[in-house]
Design a protein with these regions (language model features):
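Hydrophobic/aromatic residues in alpha-helical transmembrane segments
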Residues: 1, 13, 32, 173-180, ...
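Membrane-embedded helical hairpins/re-entrant loop segments and their flanking transmembrane helices
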Residues: 1-17, 180-196
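Signature of the 12-TM Major Facilitator Superfamily
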Residues: 10, 44-48, 160, 191, ...
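Transmembrane helix-loop-helix hairpins in multi-pass inner-membrane proteins
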Residues: 15-130, 209, 213-271
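A short amphipathic helical element positioned immediately N-terminal to and/or at the very start
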Residues: 36, 141-153
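Core segments of transmembrane alpha-helices
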Residues: 60-64, 141-144, 165-177
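Short, membrane-interfacial amphipathic segments enriched in basic
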Residues: 124-145
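Membrane-interface helix starts
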Residues: 150-164
Length: 271
């Protein structure tokens, strides 16, 4: 069933809003799935589309960031220890997640064995209290991603389209500080800002804070200080972060509220 454009846009706003207010952006997809199912789109088809999009987007962020790190390696190595550690942490977390997704897509049984071993180890260490419940969650997650992976294997061009769309989306997002500079009358190179934002995103994306609040602002000031100076980097940070996160948080919150109450009392449309 084809999802109308405006309905898709409202789901995207929902994803942004709940991702922004939950640690490590964990709340976006479950709420997207909730609203899609509530609106009459089948749970299986909804989860397929969300999982496929999330899998490719995760890999796009990693590839984009790693390419920019490789192209600006000397700049990265010249940063402080905290930035380098954040970057390594981000690469490891995103790399692990992307690798696990690929493993599930192409070899679900092996991925299930690995995740069950990890769950067993965490249970023996006392980190996981309810081992059976954790195993059920792992098996359910593997099953969902395997079905999404089967779709991507059957329609590889869909993955290519999602990758291209994600790359364009990330490019637009990463260029917000550049346009903030231009708005403030500061001369800047779009290429430098694109590289810095890709590195910054990769460094803070895995920080378990809602919207990476604090980590994003602090890392922004450290990275951009060498390019703009302390005074200008603070002004650019306020404007660009205000546009790309706080303004979008308000807009997506209003859109989510509309989505929540607009269909209250209306029956779900048939699938």
């Amino acid at each position: 069933k084809k999802v109308p454009y405006w309905r898709s846009l409202s789901y995207a706003f929902t994803d942004f809003y709940f991702s922004a207010i939950t640690p490590s952006a964990t709340g976006g997809q479950p709420m997207q799935l909730y609203y899609m199912v509530r609106d009459g789109f089948g749970a299986a088809h909804s989860s397929f589309s969300l999982l496929a999009t999330a899998a490719v987007y995760q890999m796009t962020v990693l590839v984009y960031g790693c390419v920019m790190v490789g192209a600006n390696l000397s700049f990265v190595m010249g940063q402080g220890r905290i930035i380098r550690l954040l970057l390594v942490f981000g690469v490891l977390v995103n790399g692990f997640c992307s690798g696990l997704i690929l493993l599930i897509i192409f070899h679900g049984l092996l991925a299930e064995k690995i995740m069950l071993c990890i769950a067993g180890g965490l249970s023996r260490a006392g980190i996981i209290k309810n081992r059976k419940r954790a195993i059920r969650k792992v098996e359910g997650l593997i099953d969902e991603y395997s079905r999404g992976g089967a779709y991507l294997r059957q329609y590889p061009l869909a993955a290519v389209r999602i990758f291209i769309h994600s790359a364009v989306q990330l490019t637009a997002l990463y260029l917000v500080p550049y346009w903030a500079c231009r708005a403030l009358g500061i001369s800047a190179s779009a290429k430098d800002f694109l590289a810095l934002q890709a590195i910054l995103s990769l460094a803070v994306t895995a920080v378990p804070l809602p919207g990476s609040v604090g980590a994003s602002e602090g890392s922004f000031l450290v990275l951009y200080r060498t390019l703009l100076g302390a005074g200008q980097s603070f002004s650019v940070m306020l404007l660009s972060r205000g546009i790309s996160f706080y303004a979008m948080l308000c807009i997506s919150g209003l859109a989510t509220a509309f989505l929540q109450f607009a269909r209250r009392g209306k029956p779900a449309s048939p699938v």
